[in-house]
Protein backbone atom coordinates (compact mmCIF):
# COMPACT_ATOMS: atom_id res chain seq x y z
CA UNK A 1 0.00 0.00 0.00
CA UNK A 2 1.44 3.35 -1.04
CA UNK A 3 1.55 6.14 1.53
CA UNK A 4 0.19 9.44 0.26
CA UNK A 5 2.04 12.74 0.60
CA UNK A 6 -0.82 14.11 2.70
CA UNK A 7 -0.42 11.21 5.14
CA UNK A 8 3.33 11.85 5.41
CA UNK A 9 2.67 15.55 6.06
CA UNK A 10 0.02 14.74 8.69
CA UNK A 11 2.46 12.35 10.40
CA UNK A 12 5.13 15.08 10.48
CA UNK A 13 2.76 17.78 11.76
CA UNK A 14 1.67 15.68 14.70
CA UNK A 15 5.27 15.78 16.01
CA UNK A 16 5.67 19.58 15.80
CA UNK A 17 4.57 22.06 18.47
CA UNK A 18 4.99 25.84 18.61
CA UNK A 19 5.56 27.46 22.02
CA UNK A 20 4.52 31.12 21.61
CA UNK A 21 5.79 32.18 25.06
CA UNK A 22 9.37 31.22 24.15
CA UNK A 23 8.95 31.59 20.36
CA UNK A 24 10.35 28.07 19.92
CA UNK A 25 9.36 25.21 17.65
CA UNK A 26 9.61 21.87 19.45
CA UNK A 27 9.63 18.40 17.92
CA UNK A 28 8.97 15.05 19.51
CA UNK A 29 10.99 13.24 16.85
CA UNK A 30 14.67 13.56 16.08
CA UNK A 31 15.39 14.97 12.63
CA UNK A 32 18.19 13.70 10.43
CA UNK A 33 20.57 16.05 8.65
CA UNK A 34 22.99 14.64 6.06
CA UNK A 35 25.64 17.10 7.28
CA UNK A 36 25.46 15.91 10.89
CA UNK A 37 26.38 12.59 12.43
CA UNK A 38 26.85 11.10 15.87
CA UNK A 39 28.99 8.00 16.35
CA UNK A 40 30.71 5.82 18.91
CA UNK A 41 33.54 3.27 18.86
CA UNK A 42 35.06 1.18 21.64
CA UNK A 43 38.55 -0.22 21.02
CA UNK A 44 40.82 -2.59 22.93
CA UNK A 45 44.01 -2.15 20.90
CA UNK A 46 46.41 0.61 19.90
CA UNK A 47 45.83 -0.04 16.18
CA UNK A 48 44.88 2.99 14.10
CA UNK A 49 41.29 2.93 12.83
CA UNK A 50 38.82 5.16 10.97
CA UNK A 51 36.72 6.98 13.53
CA UNK A 52 34.73 8.50 10.65
CA UNK A 53 34.75 8.90 6.86
CA UNK A 54 32.92 11.09 4.36
CA UNK A 55 32.93 11.60 0.59
CA UNK A 56 35.48 14.27 -0.33
CA UNK A 57 33.56 15.19 -3.50
CA UNK A 58 30.51 16.20 -1.44
CA UNK A 59 32.06 18.05 1.50
CA UNK A 60 35.03 20.40 1.89
CA UNK A 61 35.39 20.72 5.67
CA UNK A 62 34.39 18.98 8.89
CA UNK A 63 34.20 19.78 12.59
CA UNK A 64 34.24 17.09 15.24
CA UNK A 65 33.68 17.15 18.97
CA UNK A 66 35.22 13.97 20.38
CA UNK A 67 34.81 12.73 23.95
CA UNK A 68 36.77 9.69 25.11
CA UNK A 69 36.80 7.64 28.29
CA UNK A 70 38.92 4.79 29.66
CA UNK A 71 37.98 3.76 33.18
CA UNK A 72 38.24 6.95 35.25
CA UNK A 73 40.30 8.82 32.59
CA UNK A 74 38.67 11.32 30.25
CA UNK A 75 39.80 13.24 27.16
CA UNK A 76 37.80 15.68 25.04
CA UNK A 77 38.88 17.62 21.96
CA UNK A 78 37.49 19.59 19.05
CA UNK A 79 38.91 18.82 15.61
CA UNK A 80 38.59 20.80 12.39
CA UNK A 81 39.73 19.55 9.02
CA UNK A 82 39.67 20.78 5.45
CA UNK A 83 40.88 19.20 2.21
CA UNK A 84 41.74 20.18 -1.34
CA UNK A 85 40.86 16.82 -2.88
CA UNK A 86 44.39 15.48 -2.35
CA UNK A 87 45.66 16.62 1.05
CA UNK A 88 43.85 17.01 4.37
CA UNK A 89 44.80 19.73 6.88
CA UNK A 90 43.77 19.03 10.48
CA UNK A 91 43.91 20.99 13.73
CA UNK A 92 42.87 20.19 17.31
CA UNK A 93 41.88 22.75 19.90
CA UNK A 94 39.82 22.99 23.05
CA UNK A 95 41.56 19.93 24.48
CA UNK A 96 40.47 18.99 28.01
CA UNK A 97 41.94 15.86 29.53
CA UNK A 98 43.25 14.16 32.60
CA UNK A 99 45.09 11.67 30.35
CA UNK A 100 45.89 11.45 26.63
CA UNK A 101 43.62 8.67 25.41
CA UNK A 102 44.17 8.94 21.65
CA UNK A 103 45.83 10.86 18.83
CA UNK A 104 44.18 11.90 15.58
CA UNK A 105 45.21 12.32 11.96
CA UNK A 106 43.34 12.58 8.66
CA UNK A 107 43.93 11.55 5.07
CA UNK A 108 42.18 10.84 1.78
CA UNK A 109 41.77 7.24 0.67
CA UNK A 110 39.92 6.66 -2.58
CA UNK A 111 36.77 8.78 -2.57
CA UNK A 112 36.76 9.42 1.18
CA UNK A 113 38.30 11.70 3.77
CA UNK A 114 39.16 9.61 6.83
CA UNK A 115 39.48 10.83 10.41
CA UNK A 116 42.04 8.38 11.83
CA UNK A 117 42.29 7.61 15.53
CA UNK A 118 45.08 5.83 17.40
CA UNK A 119 44.18 4.82 20.96
CA UNK A 120 46.99 5.34 23.48
CA UNK A 121 46.22 2.11 25.34
CA UNK A 122 45.01 -1.42 24.65
CA UNK A 123 42.66 -1.03 27.62
CA UNK A 124 39.03 -0.58 26.53
CA UNK A 125 38.62 3.03 25.37
CA UNK A 126 35.35 4.53 24.13
CA UNK A 127 35.37 7.41 21.62
CA UNK A 128 32.11 9.28 20.97
CA UNK A 129 31.80 12.07 18.42
CA UNK A 130 29.46 14.61 16.91
CA UNK A 131 30.31 15.68 13.35
CA UNK A 132 29.23 18.62 11.23
CA UNK A 133 30.16 18.78 7.52
CA UNK A 134 30.30 21.80 5.22
CA UNK A 135 29.42 21.35 1.53
CA UNK A 136 32.09 21.76 -1.11
Where are the predicted features?
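Broad, structure-driven detector of short, well-ordered beta-strand segments within folded domains
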Residues: 16, 30, 77-83, 104-106
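Low-complexity intrinsically disordered segments
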Residues: 95-136
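Beta-strand elements of well-folded, non-transmembrane domains
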Residues: 68-70, 83, 133-135
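Glycine-rich, low-complexity segments
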Residues: 3-53, 132-136
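Generic recognition of long tandem-repeat/solenoid scaffolds
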Residues: 25-27, 51, 90, 110-118
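Terminal beta-strand-rich extracellular "head" domains
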Residues: 80-100
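Surface-exposed ligand/attachment interfaces on beta-rich extracellular proteins
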Residues: 37-60, 69-73, 87, 98, ...
